[in-house]
Each structure stands twice: as C-alpha cells, then as structure tokens.
Amino acid sequence: MTGPKPVPGPVDGVATMWGDEDAAVERILKLTERIFGPPPSGELWVGDDAAVVEVTSPLLLSCDAVVEGVHFDLAFSSLEDVGWKALTVAVSDIAAMGGCPTHAVCTMAVPQGTDVERLAAGVAEAGAEWSCRIVGGDLTSASQIVLSVTVTGRLHGTAPAVRRSGAAPGDELFVTGPLGASAAGLRNLREGAREGALVDAHRRPRARLAEGMAARRAGVSAMMDVSDGLALDLRRLAHASGVGVALFGVPVAAGATESEALGGGEDYELLMATRDPDRLAAAFQAAGLRPPLHIGACTADVSECTLEGRPMPLLGWQHAIGRPASQRSS
C-alpha cells in the first residue's frame, strides 16, 4: 500500500476504515495475514511501499478492473461480492493462458464512508479460493467504487502459454460450460430475485483454472475466456488467428436465453480451439472435470462467422466505447 492520501472534504462521521487510512491499511494487513499467513522468508507483502515476491520464468501478468455502474450494482451485490469479482476476473485471464495465479495487488478507489474492509474481505476470500496471495495495493478516494487488480501467475511444465492466435482452419471449437448464467442472474435480480444459481453466477463468477491447465496440457491451439459474450469473444479469437468460425449450436445455461448466452458476458468460461478433440476430452476426464462442450469449428474463410448456417448476431459488450457491440458504428 502506498502512503496516505488526503481525504477530500470533512471526515467527521465518516467510517473509521476510510477516515483513517493508516488504520484501514493495518486492518487489511491483519486480514490478509489471517487468511494467507505470513510471507515466506525473503518476501514482503502488504504494508511496504512495494511487495517483494519470488517469481518464476516465464511470468504471467494481467490486470482487470471493476467499476460501479458498469460491472456491478450495489443494489444487487454486496461489497464482499464486488471484491470477489474484482480478483476473480483478473485470475480468469491467467486461466485463459493455461496458468495458475500466484500473487495480486489491488487498488481500491472508493467514496467516503465505504467499508473498505468488506471489499478487502471479498478480495481475500477469492484469493484464498484461487490460491492467489494478496501482497499489496492502494487505497484512495473516488466518486464511485473502482477496484483494479493486477495478478501474476506461472506455468506448470514446459509447454508455452496458450494464446488466442493459434487456431487454424479445421480446428474444433469448445467451451468449458454453458453460457448466459451471469446475464440471466442480473435479469433475475432486476426482476426481484435475491438468490439462486443464476444470481450466484452473477455475483460470484468462477475462474476456470483447472480447465485452463487441462486444456494447455492437451495442447489446445488457442484459448481465451468469455468475458464480453461468446459472439464478440469468438470474433476476437478468430481475428487473432486469421480464421473464420462456424458454430452449430450454443450451450445455454438453464434459465438463460440464447441472446444472453451469445452476448450477456461475464461467464468466464473458456473458449478453446483444438486439433485433437479426443486428447482434450481425455485431459478433462483425467483432471476430474466435466467434459468440454463442442460448439463448432474454425474455417478458412476469414469473413465467416455463422451460427447454424446463418450470420451470427454481433452481440457482446465493448467497454472502451461504453455500449453493446451491436451498436458500434461500422
């Protein structure tokens, strides 16, 4: 954590966890020590100007952010849920490379009065779930909650990280699970639901770490996580690889719609291309995982992007331009 920053405006009546940043950092330090234990000899975690960690080569490095009003609504998610999501979506990028996370730092920008310990508890809970140690971060003021997480990871074995650019014509396409659950969960929350599997999928996404490592062991040619909707992320993989794609179906989560599966986003299932489907299935079985779901194939026609022989709708979310992909100007 970096040094204290002035808190704008009067602090009378502000929750102590924000009015006194040093005290907040001290409580977060105790929280991380309770969950992760003391750092190994030679490492420094939360509390200094920078963390000191042992790294392996090659090092995986990814960052992601969640923003109030874009990625979550506090009417539907607790602060702990927000912290969980912030770390998990960054860890998902490590999973998409076939790696496993090691350490994370988290910046929390929050309005006055925000219970930052609850946010930190959610981050730490996810860190414990994904074996990712929280080793530092920053705390500052903002008009809305923004959490930015940077995660490091490593690769087991000698195989290289899996990129999204390695697919070739003839490769078969798979996903690790049904899609659309998060979007359906948000829809249910807006309609008054407060619990259920779909709501859980929206509030507490899962990173497919075991699946990503199994896919890498199976020699998949390309892989990425489905964060912005299958229709959009599939186009990204196809563009990076210089291939077309032809889907024969979309696995829709129970209670979700096909539109939510194609464009809802925040599923964090893994999209994989492989030249050896049997090897992929065997790797998943050996790891005790549910079988990957076959959805289509890569083609030589780079302009092809079809679903059941028809042009696939351009659904998904473009965060940089702040509107659904279907509303992009051509």
Model-assigned labels for residue ranges:
Residues 56, 66, 100-187, 297:
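Glycine-rich anion-binding loops of enzyme active sites
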Residues 152, 271-275:
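Short hydrophobic/aromatic beta-strand micro-patches
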Residues 1-78, 97, 102, 106, ...:
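Extreme N-terminal cap/leader segments of soluble proteins
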Residues 114-117, 276-283:
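Short, conserved charged micro-motifs
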Residues 113, 200-267, 299:
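Active-site-proximal betaalpha loop/short-helix elements
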Residues 3, 7-9, 203-206, 282-330:
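Acidic, Ser/Thr/Pro-rich beta/coil linker or hinge segments at domain junctions
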Residues 183-201:
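Short, compositionally biased
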Residues 79-103, 118-129, 210-214, 232-237:
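Small-aliphatic-rich amphipathic alpha-helix that forms the alpha element of a beta-alpha
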